[in-house]
Amino acid sequence: MKHYKRALLASLASMVFVIAATQALAQAPADNSKIAQMQGADRQQRLVEGAKKEKELTFYTSAPVDDMAVLTEAFEKKYGIKVKVWRAGSEKVLQRAATEARAGRFDVDIIDTNGPEMEVLHREKLLVEVKSPFLADLIPQAILPHREWISSRLNIFTGGYNTKLIKKEDLPKSYEDLLNPKWKGKLGIEAEDFDWFSGVIGELGEAKGLKLFRDIVATNGISVRKGHTLLTNLVASGEVPLALTVYNYKAEQLKNKGAPIDWFAFPPAIARPNGTGMLRRAPHPHAAVLFFDFMLSDAQELLLKRDFIPTSKKVKTPLNQMPIKFIDPRVILDDEAKWSKLYQEIIVKQSK
């Protein structure tokens, strides 16, 4: 399971050399609030001049390598600034950033990962607000009150189905339709999607929603698989005819390659924000601010071309075509124990 608080505590517990960490902190880059919050007509010029001197930046991300390569290459071409990328799962991104900071090591400039992990970094005071002019272009839900990380794109949980095994006209219209015996042995779900579960149950009503999913699992069974990429591939292969929680962009990417897969939404579709944030002690602050701006501007069109859902209002996306409910990462972080336990008890442990 994704235990955000536990992951953070584990990373902090590993720091045993307190004296060495304190000495390292004294040599750390300065707080970059002034650069991050720079405004004015000459802002862009000052950022570019500073970034040219810094020459590079370091970027931690949990997004797929191929997708992020498109963005970093475009940034490098535009500014001539080298982007050093380290990619891992969202939990490992969080652990590495927190561990390095506690050790007084500040290598990373920008982090891009799931909303709950970004919220932990905010609460640990590792991020800084960037007063980007491109914030005005984003949907309101992309901007949290503290503004220390911004949702640059969304992971939208959708249903995925194998088009050779299931006809579009036969798809379920609601979660209640999943009680139909025709779905027996055909359903699949990802093993750690308790945040999706909390959003769906919130829409259905807690008592009604929990009973419904208990009944669905008891009646028709459900196959639990770890990893959205694996689950999506199993839908395409036909091993899982219908999955409840695939990311729409993953299904779209396979569909565009000719795989027999498509996606649909149970209204409202549940959306998890993915965020971008600048580190308060980024070693390359001017380059970091430029990259932050880039993620909210030029990168939005590039993300769309990679079948992601960007948050800019200037980009036409499925946001305009379906009702969407946004998961609040602050709520998920605070209520993780409750929803993780319910998801395990009702879905994972009862899976067939």
Regions found by a protein language model. Name each.
Residues A26-T58, E76-K77, L179-K184:
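Immediate post-signal peptide segment of exported/extracytoplasmic ligand-binding proteins
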Residues A10-A21:
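Bacterial N-terminal signal peptides
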Residues D298-K352:
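Extracellular/periplasmic juxtamembrane helices and adjacent flexible linkers that interface
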Residues T158-L165, I201-E203, R272-A287, L303:
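A bilobed periplasmic-binding-protein/Venus flytrap-type ligand-binding module shared by bacterial periplasmic
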Residues T58-T72, K84-A101, F106-E239:
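Extracytoplasmic ligand-binding site segments that recognize negatively charged/polar headgroups
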Residues A24, D137-Q141, L154-N155, W183-E192, F213-A218, I222-R225, F294-V315, ...:
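Periplasmic-binding protein-like
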Residues E117-V120, P241-P260:
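A ligand-binding cleft/hinge motif common to bilobed small-molecule-binding domains
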